[in-house]
Amino acid sequence: MIFKFESGASTMHGISRRTFLKTASASAALAAAGVDASWLMANPLGLPLGLQLYSVRDLLPKDYEGTLKQLSAISYREVEAAGFFGRSAGDVKQLMTQAGLRCVSAHYSYPDLAPHLDEVIQFGKTLGLKYIICSSPGVPDGSAAKGADGKVNRDAMTLADWRWNAEQFNRIGERVNSAEIRFGYHNHTGEFRTQDGILLYDEVLRLTDPAKVTMELDCGWMIVGGKNPVDYLERYPTRFSLLHVKDFKMSGKPGSDKEPPPSAELGQGSIDYRPIFAAAKKAAIKHAFIEQEQYDMPPMEALKIDAEYFQALTV
């Protein structure tokens, strides 16, 4: 496995007509909403710079409004939520708008999502979400992957467990999509194991209806799990709508999100995003969210490094 992926494509300092049109459309929409879009061209995907708010999970409970404003000040324009800390959808929307941010997606674990789906959908509609993402799977009653505490061990899930999840995702996706929000699933590393000669993630892709379930590709976790995002973006160019962009200092062999390699700022670890972004530009990616799991410096300093790397990268 080569973690610094090599690309035979030459580096391009311009952008394609397709990327220009996508960028122009997004710029016009943001301008109509009163948001400065002058920064939009300065990144390799021609997309608003996004952040998964799990990256600031320790800061938001202490100063929600201030943290959002700090993120906006270092060029982030879109965010994906990972919890709302007891705030109402209206409150979150107002604070996002005041900070110059748009919350376009939100993560929910399966246990937080399935039993409360009507509430989640209504919250998302009020907030203006485009996506509701299942960030971790569930398991049926009796599954050995469910511990005594009710928590699911993804690395212990069987092929049958994942097939059950695909069925649930189709059901949930139909209901979410009827509210004009897209439903999707976000990977970690446990999906990239093989059982009975079948790669678990591939089985989820096979069994989920693309009209009901889109995919959020976490590039970092896929690589830690031993697979190459470029391969998946090329094989399934219409299945992925969102990316997670993170870096790790890899050991040279596949690992697990349970015992992950050390996190790194973008460009400081082992992952070369140029070929990944080149493949993403040819796929159906609509949003890209930087995410950093851990820090060895103040989070805002690290996230500024991440933002600057992302915006300066050429493919």
Put a short name on every predicted segment.
Residues 25, 78, 85, 102, ...:
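Active-site acidic/histidine proton-transfer and metal-coordination neighborhood
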Residues 59-70, 114-123, 225-232, 273:
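Short, acidic/polar
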Residues 1-15:
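N-terminal secretory signal peptides
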Residues 43-44, 68-73, 87-103, 118-129, ...:
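Acidic (Asp/Glu)-rich catalytic clusters
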